[in-house]
Each structure stands twice: as structure tokens, then as C-alpha cells.
Amino acid sequence: MLRLTQRRTLTLQAPEIPGGEPHVSAASGLVRTGHQVHVVADDSLHLATFALEGNTPGTLLRLLPGELPLDAKARKALKPDLEALCLLRDLPGAPHGALLAVPSGSTAVRMKGALVPLAEDGRPTGQVREVDFTDLYAQLARELGPLNVEGAALAGTRLRLLNRGNGDVGADAVVDLDGGRVLRALEAGEALQPDVVRTVRRWDLGKAGNVRLSFTDAAPLPDGRIVFTATAEDTRDSYSDGAVMGSAVGVLAPDGTPMFLDGVDQKVKLEGVDARVERGRIHLLLVADADDPAVAAPLFETVLEGVPA
């Protein structure tokens, strides 16, 4: 079992909207660049950036237009549900890389993501572009049924998406997209099309208690493997929240086959992961969704023992 150590909570300099809480609660995607970490939340229109060291409150960068209501039920119905954050390295228009915020696709209003170019120091530049996933997700829904995309990572020439199969009819799946085609579409400002899909494979990750574990995020390793998080949430569908029975961390082989899975020592809803190899070991940063807007999401760290770096 992996031992989680809390590094900080995701407090903000100011709330996203007047009357809101000055923190990120529903943390759902995580990427480290330079001396900062970037987080998307599934109930937010912004990217949050935090210093890697210390507890200095984070800052916000708008990703999508509009405003979300404070009322939890109304907010849930209108939110863009940004569930994954992916670091891209080979965009001609972003020489220092870019962040791709990926929506879940679980409802018709959850089809728009965002592309954020990075500066040399890894900070977002503010030159944000909207990315339309509608046509791509329509194709994936025809193959998988209800969508709930929660992980994205660039692995070699493929952009790998992880579909969360929580609920009665959802399917956990590894979806490989043609990375070159995706990057060209992003560079041209075009919507992502069905022709970027290469393979779609379903997987069963097992259970925590009597509840099925389902993918919640992904992070690449240098050799093409991908670290993923998974959570067992007792819910009937991809829209509703439920009791969290446990979370786990795993590894996908370069071909997308699950090759390692281990639980964590706290009953938290892990939703975001960043992985890097340091001193011959795989070090992880992780965020959890508090599922309570009054509670700040935690940032954890751990070392992935038992897996060669």
C-alpha cells in the first residue's frame, strides 16, 4: 500500500467568483512544470497555478468564457467538467510546451477544453485557445457508450485518453489518439475529429470493497509507460457523485496494458497525478477532489515503490 504525505492545500489568492471560497476544491488534473504545479478543477472555468514549494496561495487563469453559479446543483449542470491536464512538448506555436485541458464529455456542455502555451519558466502565458472535442467524443461515445474522460497523457506518438467507467454502464477504457494529427489540429485551431482515433480498449481494474475501481487521471513516464490513478466511487452513473471506497495508483505498459496497481493508505478521491523519475525512483504528486466546495483540495506526494524507474 502506498503512503500519501500531504504537501499543502490548494488555497488561492482570491476566489474564482465573488462569494466563493478562496481555494480549489474539486481538483481533477495536475501537471508540474518548472517550480510550479498547475491544476484544473471539474467545477471551474480557470487554471490554478501554485508554487511547488511552500504554501503561497495560487493564482487563476481563465480558460473558458462565462460565469458559473454558486449554487452547487446549478453549477454542476453548467460546468465544463475539465477533468484532465496534459503537457504537450512539440507544438510549433508553443516552443516551451503547452497545457491541454481536457473535458469529460459526460454531457453536451462538457465538450470544450483549452490550450495554454507555456513560457520558458513553465508558467502559463495567458494566450489561451478553446479546443472543441465534440466530434471526437461523438465517435468515442458510439464505441464506448457513456463517456467520462478523466485522464490524458502523451506517450510517444500517441495521445492516450483514459475513460472512467464508473456507474452501471460505463466502461473503463484506454483510447489511443494519433498524436501527430492531434498536434496539427491544435496548432491550426481546429476541432478534434474522429480520424485521430487509433485504438479503443476496455479494461477491468478490479474493486475496492464491492465497488469497481475506475480511471481518474494519467501522467507519462519517459519510457512510454503511464502512471494512472483510479478511484472506487459508489455511484450509478458518470454524472452523480457517490461515497468513495478507496483509491489506487497503477502503471500502464507502453502498449496500454495495466501492469501494476496498488492502493493508497487514505480514503480519498484521487483525481490528478504528475510523475517524474528522480534519483532512480518514480516520484508522484497527486491531488484529490474533496467533493465539498467548503474544503480545500490537498496536494499529496508519494514514491511508487516496487516499480522500476
How would you name each of these model-derived features?
Residues M1-A309:
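Sequence/structural signature of beta-propeller domains
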